[in-house]
Amino acid sequence: MGTNDALTSTEDAVTAGANDAPLPAPPEPPRKARRATSRTSDFRVAEQPAYVLHSYPYRETSLIIDVLTRDHGRLALVAKGAKRPHSALRGVLQTFQPLLLSWSGKSEVRTLTGAEWVGGMLPLGGDGLLCGFYANELLVKFCAREDPQPPLFNHYVLTLTRLAHGEPAVQVLRSFERVLLRETGYAMALNRTVARRAVEPDRRYVFDPERGVRNADDEVPSHWPVISGQTLLDMEQDDYHRAQTVAQSKTLMRFLLNTYLGGTPLATRQILIDLQNL
């Protein structure tokens, strides 16, 4: 499958890895995202399952790493000395690899005290790598700091595993996007309308970003994409074997993600557009 068909919500592309060109500074999460309390405490956490989403230089020899952890949500950690040539952290703090991280501190940016590579994850390549960078960017933009979301963490691991094994990127990404929206407060059923009527496969609908599925015959903004009932039912079941469902689900998710991000562009999308223009 080609990259154009695989990547969604902006036809994404490769973005920076853990030690490559940085992503833009993460914006505030969308307004519906659940926010953790502002309380911080001086504590130590040992051997927490985690993945590096992104990193950027800090001072001369260190890195700030943006990580997704299983039980503590998304965090920023300072990895002191990680840029030094002989640092043991250089080869460990890589994206898409399962880690056990330890940290301490009471500030918003905690101090990394240990990092262990767990292993067992196949490396991503080709379209799978592009999709992985796309998933990381969505997590950075949608997830509030210190908001534990174990189901989202587990689905992220599943997403990487499926991509590494070469499963169709279209289905893998659509599934990830829906879980991401659900866990960050945007979940709405696709099999029932806002009037609580069952979606019919032969009818035409639109998706109101604030309310859910509505009849296409209603008075709605013209830029809302029209989606068949069959596509909505297929998406509810995570079924993407129909060509129409593949095309319409991509259009719908692009529209919803763009709306919830307030029109903020994704770096992965622009990189792919630039590559296609070569």
UniProtKB/Swiss-Prot annotation:
Pfam families: RecO_C (PF02565), RecO_N (PF11967). SUPFAM superfamilies: ArfGap/RecO-like zinc finger (SSF57863), Nucleic acid-binding proteins (SSF50249). Residues 1-12 have a biased composition (Polar residues). InterPro entries: ARFGAP/RecO, DNA_rep/recomb_RecO_N, NA-bd_OB-fold, RecO, RecO_C. Residues 1-42 are annotated as: Disordered. GO terms for cellular component: bacterial nucleoid. GO terms for biological process: DNA recombination; double-strand break repair. Keywords: DNA damage, DNA recombination, DNA repair. HAMAP family: RecO. Belongs to the RecO family. Involved in DNA repair and RecF pathway recombination. This is DNA repair protein RecO. It comes from Burkholderia lata (strain ATCC 17760 / DSM 23089 / LMG 22485 / NCIMB 9086 / R18194 / 383).
